[in-house]
Amino acid sequence: MTGLRAAFASTLAATLLMATPVVAQTREAPKYGGSLEIGTVYVTISALSWDSADFNWKHNHDTGQFYEQLFAADLSKARRNGGTQAFVLDAHLPSEAIRGELAESWEWKQNPLRVEIKLRKGIMFPEKAGVMKAREFVAEDVVFSYDRLDKSPKKILGYFDHVEKVEATDRHTVVFTLKHPFAEWDYRFGWGYMSGIMPKEVVDAGAANWRNATGTGPFQLTDFVSGNSNTYTRNPAYWDKEKIGDKEYQIPFVDKVVYRTIKDEATFVTALRTGKLDILEAIRWQNVESLKKSAPQLKWNRWLAQSGTFLAMRVDQDGPFKDVRVRRALNMAVNKAEIVKEYYSGNAELFAYPQHPDYGGYFEPLDKMPASVRELFAYDPARAKKLLAEAGYPKGFSFKVQVCSCNPDHMDLLPLVAAYLEQVGVKLEIQPMEYGAFLSAMTSRTMTAGYFMNNGHTNPTTTIRKSFVTGQTWNPSGWSDPAYDAKMEAAYREPDEAKREAMLRDLTREILDKAPYIWLPTPYVYSAWWPWVKNYGGELRAGAVRPGPIYARIWVDQDLKKKMGF
């Protein structure tokens, strides 16, 4: 079996900054049973779609417990097992950290360029009353799932343009034929956001209805209350095992996993403190010290946020933001170093977007950037006023900014940004929105001139493509430059990893310099869990925002939980 990206020579290793290094744990014999109550990374946001054809970013987070994929993270490489991987990156798996999930083996072949994937035999879709009888997962299920995405009217522009065809050559073999080398072939339909394998019977019954959902995964969705909870129940016929010590164990260990949706920050922090949550995956630094004092038994992991924070300035409509001098001025008007020091109390990096520091050779630190980029991160209100005057706005201007009320950090940070801008004559009209309306404003291109958001880094190529290539859904500024688009396409087709890294560094420098956003610091985030949560070290994703395989390997020490008074 060849390496997953043998054709593309990927050697990137992701390494996360930690508050306390996670070392290989003493392996206890697991115990079955109990439930796992989780406030996930997206604790404030309920499930948005159960249908992969909607191309909704959160779909995989909520369905990855039952819709499995061809590939997933090799969790044996986690730091808690003595490996090198933190598994917190939102949608980036280094080649050496990928395993076959539904795929048993794969091999690259030439003339034509294709990857031949052998599927595991004997994996079953369980019976689902009113939807389907139990049956074996086969290659046609992969072809069906791919074709349905490819034909979806909601498909991301150009998403599968590199694929010539997908075909089942026998019951347990599927072949992807490519038009040319493509750096993201495995991410796009292997372990990506929409890569879950959905049986045709679910589509026939209605894939948008959660009650019809069923897949080959370790858990089945048994209840959903919008804005409150997702409940996943153990699949007793699940095929995979977890090796602990020298012994393999059938998984999952817990009987039930429950996602709790809690919009209020104080409420979900209290839920962790009082043991109502076993794990809380995303905690702002402001809450850490109080939690450590009131619940000293909690275990911790610290990680640099997997999304960039910025104020997008629309360049696709007439107004001040058409002028690069205005965009650069607004960057210089915000004291970003002071935000790191005073607002985040040092718990942030001044520069960590659009590339992430954990992306190895794709990332170029600020001190290596051209002077024209560096000055965007230096506070210079006098220079900002001069640029505004040169652009025809000596007295400034005002504009509206939408922000999601679901994000406590943004609700606190945006008024601070507004105060800086007001010092150079630019006034913001802030419009908080619930998440559904906020997301819809972007996807329908009805947002205001300013749009304050997080956007996931995803991976070293997608972070540029989705944010700055013409017509992409997650391009809030409306950036469009045919020459830039062509350079991005060339990077995707470059099979040499070192050359591709250099191309992406150039693309990153260029877009930073053009300043379609007010670039803001990237905060550190904390995860915490109680010591009765076993076989866990703070891992968050085993694919594209997909935690399902991680939860399947956790077991709960119910005796310890009782001993601790919970």
Specify the residue positions occupied by each region the protein language model found.
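Extracellular/periplasmic solute-recognition and catalytic clefts
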Residues: 165-166, 222-233, 260-318, 337, ...
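Detector for C-terminal structural segments
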Residues: 40, 44-46, 55-65, 225-230, ...
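Gly/Pro-rich hinge or "lid" segments in bacterial periplasmic/extracellular proteins
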Residues: 74-79, 85-93, 97, 187-258, ...
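N-terminal lobe/hinge region of extracytoplasmic solute-binding protein
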Residues: 37-110, 214
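Ligand-site clamp/hinge motif
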Residues: 135, 204-210, 238-290, 306, ...
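Surface-exposed binding/hinge segments that line
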Residues: 31, 107, 111, 116-121, ...
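Aromatic- and charge-enriched surface segment that lines or borders ligand/interaction sites
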Residues: 97, 102-153, 259, 268-271, ...
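Alpha-helical secondary-structure segments
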Residues: 37-40, 134, 138-143, 171-175, ...
